[in-house]
């Protein structure tokens, strides 16, 4: 760990002259959570990695692809640890920093935890970006951490070809209130906190087709902290949570299904969608990650033959800083919706239900 400003200053001192006002996205082959390694390839890579030590205090590790690690400290406290970083999804450096920080802290909220501390992860093409530009990225991240009530206490930086920014996030949660993605129960209803479509909007932005209103809508959703997860984690009827990010709604719901040894059904008509994203998706705008997501897990999805392609695009659309997906008892659904809506998530909706697996079919996801 190092002093961020000092390290970046020394990197800049040895760099060649930089371009004036470059677009951040021009350096990135992908953007936001859309630059994740495809889920199928990621499983193949991780299958080759040794498991390592699993101490008894480790409550949540890598076994169910959960959002964060959880380590029991004592009878009343567990440490939530996560990291998330990515390449630019937007050109404005301040907005890039805000989006990346919001996305990183979401993993703590998805476990029902309360953030306490962050470390910055910074990779920048020092020869290409002015110090003022890099500073604005850091300012954006710091503004979100102030909103979350936590400090950025340090970090690490490197000189790389593509801009990268994100956080290590640490939080606390009561061991009895950890909300895993593997604890859903048959009969649970599914509540989604944010509308889908951020990936489609980012694709339109990269093509130079997104207008100011569309950009503002995209920014509003991607910089909205999922702080409601702290309250949801205290509800007895909430059984499982995750946040919808790079693998899309279908991919992250399948992780809940597999971890819980269940299946799920989603009502397409109930899904909250970003209005302008629907327009672009109807016109065929999509990220490359959306197709890679479907290729990775489409065999485990029952998709209606008469459903249009644009709906599938939005169900596999990589969400950067997406919403919380909650699996809760039906009796708890009104309180869960109220918690979302009172926290500013106006489009939160019940979108489906968890159910037992059909005989010999394993965990599956059906859209209807």
Task: Give residue spans per PLM region.
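Helix-biased detector of long, well-ordered alpha-helical tracts
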Residues: 4-368
């Amino acid at each position: 760990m190092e002093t961020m400003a000092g390290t970046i200053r020394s990197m800049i001192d040895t760099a060649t002259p930089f371009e004036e006002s470059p677009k951040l996205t021009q350096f990135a082959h992908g953007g936001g959570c859309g630059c994740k390694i495809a889920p199928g390839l990621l499983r193949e890579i991780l299958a080759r990695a040794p498991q390592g030590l699993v101490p008894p205090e480790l409550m949540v590790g890598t076994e169910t692809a959960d959002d964060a690690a959880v380590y029991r400290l004592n009878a009343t406290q567990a440490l939530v640890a996560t990291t998330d970083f990515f390449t630019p999804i937007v050109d404005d450096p301040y907005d890039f920093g805000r989006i990346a920080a919001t996305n990183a802290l979401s993993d703590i909220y998805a476990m029902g935890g309360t953030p306490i501390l962050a470390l910055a992860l910074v990779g920048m093409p020092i020869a290409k970006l002015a110090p003022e530009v890099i500073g604005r990225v850091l300012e954006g991240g710091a503004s979100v951490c102030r909103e979350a009530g936590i400090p950025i206490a340090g970090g690490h930086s490197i000189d790389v070809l593509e801009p990268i920014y994100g956080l290590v996030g640490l939080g606390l949660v009561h061991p009895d209130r950890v909300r895993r993605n593997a604890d859903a129960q048959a009969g649970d209803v599914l509540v989604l906190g944010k509308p889908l479509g951020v990936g489609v909007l980012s694709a339109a932005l990269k093509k130079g087709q997104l207008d100011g209103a569309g950009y503002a809508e995209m920014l509003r959703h991607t910089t909205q902290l999922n702080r409601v997860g702290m309250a949801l984690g205290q509800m007895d009827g909430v059984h499982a949570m995750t946040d919808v990010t790079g693998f899309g709604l279908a991919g992250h719901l399948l992780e809940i299904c597999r971890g819980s040894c269940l299946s799920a059904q989603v009502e397409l008509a109930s899904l909250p969608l970003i209005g302008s994203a629907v327009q672009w998706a109807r016109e065929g705008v999509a990220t490359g990650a959306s197709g890679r997501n479907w290729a990775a897990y489409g065999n485990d999805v029952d998709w209606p033959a008469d459903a249009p392609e644009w709906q599938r695009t939005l169900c596999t659309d990589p969400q950067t800083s997406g919403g919380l997906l909650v699996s809760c008892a039906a009796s708890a659904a009104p309180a869960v919706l109220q918690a979302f809506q009172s926290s500013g998530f106006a489009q939160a909706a019940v979108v489906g239900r968890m159910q037992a697996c059909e005989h010999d079919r394993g965990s599956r996801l059906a859209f209807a």
